[in-house]
Amino acid sequence: MSRFKLIKKTKAGIRLGSIKTKRGVVKTPFFMPDATRGFIKLVSGHDLKKIKMGPMVINTYHLFLQPKMEMIKKAGGAHKFMSWDNPLLSDSGGFQVFSLVHRNPEMGKIHENGVKFRSPIDGAWHDITPEKSIQIQFDLGVDMMVCFDDCPPNDYSKEKIKEAVLRTISWAERCKVEYGKQIKKRKIKESERPLLFGVIQGGVEFDLRELCTKELVKIGFDGYGFGAMPVDAEGNFLGEILEFTANLIPEGSLRFALGIGSPSDIVKCARYGWDMFDCVIPTREGRHGRLFLRKRNYKFQIPNSKEFYETINIGNSKFAADFKPINPDSKIPELREYSKAYLHHLFKLKEPLGARLASMNNLEFYLELMEKIRKSS
């Protein structure tokens, strides 16, 4: 039985729906910040609860290496370890493992059974297989999990990308089998089982994206993710291939645009029919003093939504004497009460409070953006 309900498709192409998870219902489309290692830098769980943050993404690879699974299991799972009550999605860690190995072959080797790699933390060697990745994600106790996949750079030859596609399909099948075994072993009810996502690889090749999607759909998953970087080797956004891939995924399945992205890219992809997004952009940009701000008195409209916001660099000298609030419309008291001049001062002194406030501003902006997308017609 599907846990995703597609309620309506708007004239702009936005898919309005809902997902039932063990920890509540989530409206789609939605954005998840990356709490990669079990936290968002400089932002506490209480900060996140204040802005009503929903699901977040954690990373299997990073948590497996530190604090290691024994510690998380002892804590009672990732939710208890993090003191987080809302849904969590675990990324399989495939992107991180393969980035490590592709950048430096001395750090590991890909084989048909999985990947052997050296920990960049302590130099210890580890083997991750599709089965082990699923077992770890069940131990994390997440609400949504992602199959282990082979994630090559987009500038690889078509032949090498095809090898990764075929390996990804094979591993997805093994992940699905192990997923079934874990459900049975742990006696998990249908209403409480974590959702499982297959990952569509294929680089910039349309035919390989199509091949991968069709084979994954035959295996059958709750949702399907767009794998690898959403830009080509020159940094151009892969809008055409993202739209093409979204249309290959069954209407009744969730569509997860992994690693996307900027506010304007999220709007584009929501129009293409993607339901879920995650990225480090709001918090990473915030830590570097770049803030997303809604233009006041501007009505948000999907076709020209890029004009709905501006990005400012609070470190610029023009903000040194700007005593207007950081964001007068924010629900966060500090953002309404502190001035841009004060935030500029904090960044000049490298005071962590500045990065925290900027990160909170951007997270709130993203949540409001998704709400406006859901309410647009």
Regions found by a protein language model. Name each.
Residues 13, 184, 299-303, 307:
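Charged/polar low-complexity intrinsically disordered segments
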Residues 377:
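Histidine-centered catalytic/metal-binding microenvironments
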Residues 1-189, 317-320, 348:
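Non-catalytic, usually N-terminal nucleic-acid engagement modules in DNA/RNA processing proteins
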Residues 132-135, 163-170, 174-177, 207, ...:
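Alpha-helical scaffolding segments of alpha/beta enzyme cores, especially the outer helices
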Residues 182, 195-297, 307-326:
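Glycine-rich phosphate/ribose-binding loops and adjacent secondary-structure elements
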Residues 280-296, 307-374:
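Gly/Ser/Thr/Ala-enriched C-terminal appendages of enzymes
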Residues 153-158, 162, 223-230, 352-355:
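Glycine- and acidic
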